[in-house]
Curated annotation (Swiss-Prot):
Its EC number is 3.2.1.20. Present with 5060 molecules/cell in log phase SD medium. It is an enzyme of class 3 (hydrolase). GO terms for cellular component: plasma membrane. It comes from Saccharomyces cerevisiae (strain ATCC 204508 / S288c). This is Alpha-glucosidase MAL12. GO terms for molecular function: alpha-1,4-glucosidase activity; alpha-amylase activity; glucan 1,4-alpha-maltotriohydrolase activity; oligo-1,6-glucosidase activity; sucrose alpha-glucosidase activity. Transmembrane segments: none annotated. Keywords: Glycosidase, Hydrolase, Maltose metabolism. The record marks D349 as: Transition state stabilizer.
C-alpha cells in the first residue's frame, strides 16, 4: 500500500512543503531607509533554504497607502515603491525558484484601498459603471444631531461601524476592516473578472506558485445586507460574521477562481491556494479535491482560544484540554476525505506563541519554544513557520499606546477612551489584552545580529519603521543562535529534517487519538500510517509529570525530543519537555 492509496494523502508538493511566511516591512532592509524590502528578502533566501524550508509566502508588497500594512491595495500590478520595483520582485521569484523553493504571495481581494482607481470611479457618481463594484447604501436615517445612521448594525473587525459615509454622493460604503479598506462586490461579474485578471493573472504570468487567499470566507455576503441578530447584548453593533462569512455563493466564487487559475497557467505547474476562512464549519467543502476550490485553509479556532468572540483583546481563561481540542479541529475533518489541512501557531495577525501558549521566562523560553516546535512538526497537514518563530521570538514587554503601529489597536484605543476614559477599568483590561494578543508582537523587525541598536535589520544610524523587540539583546537573534547548537533555531532545523524523514507519519498521519485528553499538563496523542504509529508526549507545565503509554506494554523507539540530557526510556517528563516516538 502506498500514500496515494489513501484519498486524503495523495502526494502533492504543497502538502509536504514547509512554508516560511515573510512580513516584508520587518524582514530585512537592503537600502537603509528603515523599511524591509524585496531585495532584503532576496539577500536572505539562502538562510531560509538552510532552515529546511520548501516555499516562501510573502505578505502584500503591492502599491498601497499602508493604512493596514499593505492589506489596503491601490494597484495589484505594481510593487509599493518603498519595497522596491516590479523587477525586484521578478528577481526574487526567479532566485527563489533557483534555490529549489516555491513562491507564494498574498491575495487580498475581499477589499481594496479607497485609493484604487476602481473605487475612485465608483465613488464619483451614483451612475458610474463601476458603482456596483462596491457596496453603496443610503443612510438608514439621521440621528438627533443630523448625522447619518449606517445602513445596518454590522461592526467592523477593527472596531466601530462597518460603514463609512462618503459625502461625494451622500451614501455609505461597506468596509469590514479599516475605514479606507473598501469591500469589493463579488456579486458583480465584471468586478470579479477585473479582480482575477489584475490580482491573479498578472502574478501567475510572472511565475508565482500559489496564493494565500486573505479573508477567503467573506466574498459572499448575506443578500440584502440585513441587520445582524443581537449576539453581543452589551453593544449596538454586532460582529459582522453572521452577515459576511460563508455566504450563499462563496463556494461558487472559489470554484470560479480555481478555474481561472487552472486555465491561466500554461506551463504545467501546479498552483496551490490556502484560504484564510477563520472558522471551520465549511473546511471540508473548501478543501475537497473533487470540488476544485482551495488546496487548504487556515482556521483560527486554536489561535483564538483564550480570547472573547466579541472582542479579541478580552483575555478569557482556557484549559490545555480546550487548546488540544481546538488544535485537533484543524485536521480531524480530513479523515476519510479528499481534503487537506494546515498546521501553524504563528502568523502576522497573531502574537508570539511562546508567550501565549508556553513560558517566555528566561528559564524556560528556549525549552518551551522547542516544545512548540515538536508539537507543530508532528501534526498532520502543510506546515507554516512565521519569521522569527524559528528563533523563539517572544512578545515585547508592555509599551505605551504611542509605540503601537497596528490600526486595530489604535482604533480600539480611541473607542475605549471615548466610551470609558483613559483611566477606566476597561482601558486597563485593554492594555493587558494588547500586551498578550496584539498583532504588533509579530511585526517587530527581524533580529539578525546582536548589534545595537537595530540588530542588523537596518543600518545602525537608521530609525526603523517600527521599534525592535529588545529580546535580541538576550540572545534571540539569528547570529547568536546560528552558532549555538542548543538554540531554538538549530532545533527547528533538526525537527524539519525529522518531519521529512518520517513524512508518512508526521505529514500524512491519520487516525489521530488523544491519550491524556483531560490532563491540563500533558498533551499526548498517537496517529498512524499503514502499520506504523507515532506517539507524542508533551509536557505543557513547569513541573515534572508522568505520561501514559499509548497502550500497555508498548515498545517505544525515540525519534526526537527537546532535552539532550534526558532518559528517553523514562515515563517522567521534565518541565516543558516533549518527545516523539515510534510505537512498536
Amino acid at each position: 500500500m502506498t500514500i496515494s492509496d489513501h484519498p486524503e494523502t495523495e502526494p502533492k508538493w504543497w502538502k509536504e512543503a514547509t512554508i516560511y511566511q515573510i512580513y516584508p516591512a520587518s524582514f530585512k532592509d537592503s537600502n537603509n531607509d528603515g523599511w524591509g524590502d524585496l531585495k532584503g528578502i532576496t539577500s536572505k533566501l539562502q538562510y531560509i533554504k538552510d532552515l529546511g524550508v520548501d516555499a516562501i509566502w510573502v505578505c502584500p508588497f503591492y502599491d498601497s497607502p499602508q493604512q493596514d500594512m499593505g492589506y489596503d491595495i491601490s494597484n495589484y500590478e505594481k510593487v509599493w515603491p518603498t519595497y522596491g520595483t516590479n523587477e525586484d520582485c521578478f528577481e526574487l521569484i526567479d532566485k527563489t525558484h533557483k534555490l529549489g523553493m516555491k513562491f507564494i504571495t498574498d491575495l487580498v481581494i475581499n477589499h481594496c484601498s479607497t485609493e484604487h482607481e476602481w473605487f475612485k470611479e465608483s465613488r464619483s457618481s451614483k451612475t458610474n459603471p463601476k458603482r456596483d463594484w462596491f457596496f453603496w447604501r443610503p443612510p438608514k436615517g439621521y440621528d438627533a444631531e443630523g448625522k447619518p445612521i449606517p445602513p445596518n448594525n454590522w461592526k467592523s473587525f477593527f472596531g466601530g461601524s462597518a460603514w463609512t459615509f462618503d459625502e461625494t454622493t451622500n451614501e455609505f460604503y461597506l468596509r469590514l476592516f479599516a475605514s479606507r479598506q473598501v469591500d469589493l462586490n463579488w456579486e458583480n461579474e465584471d468586478c470579479r473578472r477585473a479582480i482575477f485578471e489584475s490580482a491573479v493573472g498578472f502574478w501567475l504570468d510572472h511565475g508565482v506558485d500559489g496564493f494565500r487567499i486573505d479573508t477567503a470566507g467573506l466574498y459572499s455576503k448575506r443578500p440584502g445586507l440585513p441587520d445582524s441578530p443581537i449576539f453581543d447584548k452589551t453593544s449596538k453593533l454586532q460582529h459582522p460574521n453572521w452577515g459576511s462569512h460563508n455566504g450563499p455563493r462563496i463556494h461558487e466564487y472559489h470554484q470560479e477562481l480555481h478555474r481561472f487559475m487552472k486555465n491561466r497557467v500554461k506551463d504545467g505547474r501546479e498552483i496551490m491556494t490556502v484560504g484564510e476562512v477563520a472558522h471551520g464549519s465549511d473546511n471540508a467543502l473548501y478543501t475537497s479535491a473533487a470540488r476544485y476550490e482551495v488546496s487548504e485553509v487556515f482556521s483560527f479556532t486554536h489561535v483564538e482560544v483564550g480570547t472573547s468572540p466579541f472582542f479579541r483583546y478580552n483575555i478569557v481563561p482556557f484549559t490545555l484540554k480546550q487548546w488540544k481540542e481546538a488544535i485537533a479541529s484543524n485536521f480531524l475533518f480530513i479523515n476519510g476525505t479528499d481534503s487537506w489541512a494546515t498546521t501553524y501557531i504563528e502568523n502576522h495577525d497573531q502574537a508570539r506563541s511562546i508567550t501565549r501558549f508556553a513560558d517566555d521566562s528566561p528559564k524556560y523560553r528556549k525549552i518551551s519554544g522547542k516544545l512548540l516546535t515538536l508539537l507543530e512538526c508532528s501534526l498532520t497537514g502543510t506546515l507554516y513557520v512565521y519569521q522569527g518563530q524559528e528563533i523563539g521570538q517572544i512578545n515585547f514587554k508592555e509599551w505605551p499606546i504611542e509605540k503601537y503601529e497596528d490600526v486595530d489597536v489604535k482604533n480600539n484605543y480611541e473607542i475605549i477612551k471615548k466610551s470609558f476614559g483613559k483611566n477606566s477599568k476597561e482601558m486597563k483590561d485593554f492594555f493587558k489584552g494588547i500586551a498578550l494578543l496584539s498583532r504588533d508582537h509579530s511585526r517587530t523587525p527581524m533580529p539578525w545580529t546582536k548589534d545595537k541598536p537595530n540588530a542588523g535589520f537596518t543600518g545602525p544610524d537608521v530609525k526603523p519603521w517600527f521599534l525592535l523587540n529588545e529580546s535580541f539583546e538576550q540572545g534571540i537573534n539569528v547570529e547568536q543562535e546560528s552558532r549555538d547548537d542548543d538554540s531554538v533555531l538549530n532545533f527547528w532545523k533538526r525537527a524539519l529534517q525529522a518531519r521529512k524523514k518520517y513524512k508518512e507519519l508526521m505529514i500524512y498521519g491519520y487516525d489521530f487519538q488523544f491519550i491524556d485528553l483531560d490532563s491540563d499538563q500533558i498533551f499526548s496523542f498517537t496517529k498512524e500510517y499503514e502499520d506504523k504509529t507515532l506517539f507524542a508526549a508533551l509536557n505543557f507545565s513547569g513541573e515534572e509529570i508522568e505520561f501514559s503509554l499509548p497502550r500497555e506494554g508498548a515498545s517505544l523507539s525515540f525519534i526526537l525530543g527537546n532535552y539532550d540530557d534526558t532518559d528517553v526510556s523514562s515515563r517522567v517528563l521534565k518541565p516543558w519537555e516533549g518527545r516523539i516516538y515510534l510505537v512498536k
